[in-house]
Amino acid sequence: MVSETDHPLQRRYAVSPDKFRRQMQCLKVMGYTPISLDDLHGYFVNKYSNLPEKPIAITFDDGYIDNYENAFPVLKEYNFPAAIFMVSGFIGKFNMWDIANGYPEKPLMGWRELQEIVKGGVTIGSHTINHPWLTQLNSDEAKREVGESKKSLEDRLGMPINHFAYPYGDLNQPIVDMVKDAGYVTACSVRAGFNMKNTDPFILKRIGVFGEDSLWRFALKVTLGTNEGNLSDRVKYYIRRLADRIR
């Protein structure tokens, strides 16, 4: 999961354009095959086993214009699918939710950019209308954020919006149920780990990619399914592998 691909790096989830390119090259060298969220959904629904040997999904939250300017050309170059979760009430505007938290103003993609990246193989998902903490809203407000963002994107893009990402990773069971009831088929959290056959498709795990990550740490995080990529995570990974073999 990435948010921004820009210089200067102004928050943790921002990755420089050069580093993003090297990370995509790293995935290719390591033998990973990026898949779409529709592919992943099919895996959960049909339990089929014809995903590539080392599948990985690339996702972006918020839809900053630098995703279009810096990340999209690299994705096209490598022919990698990806998903970008848009805040429907701020398309073509600015990141007001970040500004309130002390971050600088940054432009978001508009409808023209969205239409172009869809043609280039990018899946558009919903990230609510206003990027709120959903569990802090009353039920009606939360349902509106989840449902109307989907409808707005569908109406403007003329295509189904099947995938959702929880702003801030903020969720509980009532929120998860709202997402299901709204007609989405998957939803992404910010919990780290691998997505297996028994993973809830409405609480998909993701690995956070941070601006300070070296290429070595990026590779380690992808391999271990962790947000940290340190030695203790590596030890825990191999212990889990051993435990799975013993069972």
Please provide the spans of the model-predicted regions.
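Short beta-strand segments
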Residues: 86, 125-128, 163-168
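Acidic (Asp/Glu)-rich catalytic clusters
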Residues: 28, 73-80, 107-126, 180
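Alpha-helical scaffolding within the catalytic cores
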Residues: 41-44, 69-70, 99-120, 147-148
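C-terminal active-site subregion of NodB/CE4 polysaccharide deacetylases
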Residues: 1-58, 66, 136-247
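A short, conserved beta-to-alpha structural element at the edge of catalytic cores
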Residues: 79-101
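Structural detector of well-ordered beta-strand residues that form the stable sheet scaffold
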Residues: 83-85, 125, 185-188
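Surface-exposed cleft-lining segments at the edges of enzyme active sites
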Residues: 93-105, 132-139
